[in-house]
A protein has these predicted regions:
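Short helix-to-turn junction characteristic of helix-turn-helix DNA-binding domains
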Residues: 41-45
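Short alpha-helical segments that sit at the start of domains
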Residues: 11-40
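Amphipathic alpha-helical dimerization/coiled-coil segments
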Residues: 13, 18-22, 106-119
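A short, conserved structural fragment
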Residues: 76-86
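General nucleic-acid-binding
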Residues: 1-8
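Short amphipathic alpha-helical interaction segments
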Residues: 62-77
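Short, cationic-aromatic polyanion-contact patches
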Residues: 86-109
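Short acidic, hydrophobic short linear motifs in intrinsically disordered regions
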Residues: 47-59
Length: 119
């Protein structure tokens, strides 16, 4: 089997596993915009960057600031993010992951590992 075929199969396995993860009742149902926003936030958090609400609203050129702000609210309601107030300027709030978001990222990472394993 060629490398490109192996990579294709691995990727499709990963997508299948992600769909299964999204059906687990432990994790809230997220629409594509929420999922994209959480993914972009996860990249920033992985790089140990603090992300203010204002910065989060501008993370993607594909998502309007208003839509991003609405989705931040819904992600907060779903228990995926929290807001921490800046210690110096109380007007600034930082978006931080909850334990549930961390578990979600772990589940996705495990899906990558599982998809890459030969069958």
């Amino acid at each position: 089997m060629s490398d490109s075929a192996k990579h294709s199969i691995t990727y499709l396995r990963f997508l299948h596993l992600v769909q299964a993860i999204r059906q687990i009742p432990t994790f809230p149902k997220m629409d594509p915009v929420e999922d994209r926003l959480l993914t972009m936030l996860g990249v920033k958090w992985h790089d140990a960057q603090q992300v203010s609400v204002l910065e989060a609203m501008g993370l993607s050129t594909e998502i309007s600031a208003t839509t991003a702000h609405r989705r931040l609210k819904t992600l907060r309601q779903k228990g995926m993010i929290e807001l921490d107030i800046d210690k110096i300027d109380s007007r600034v709030k930082y978006v931080v992951p909850t334990e549930l978001a961390r578990k979600y990222f772990v589940a996705l990472g495990q899906a990558i590992d599982k998809a890459a394993q030969p069958t």
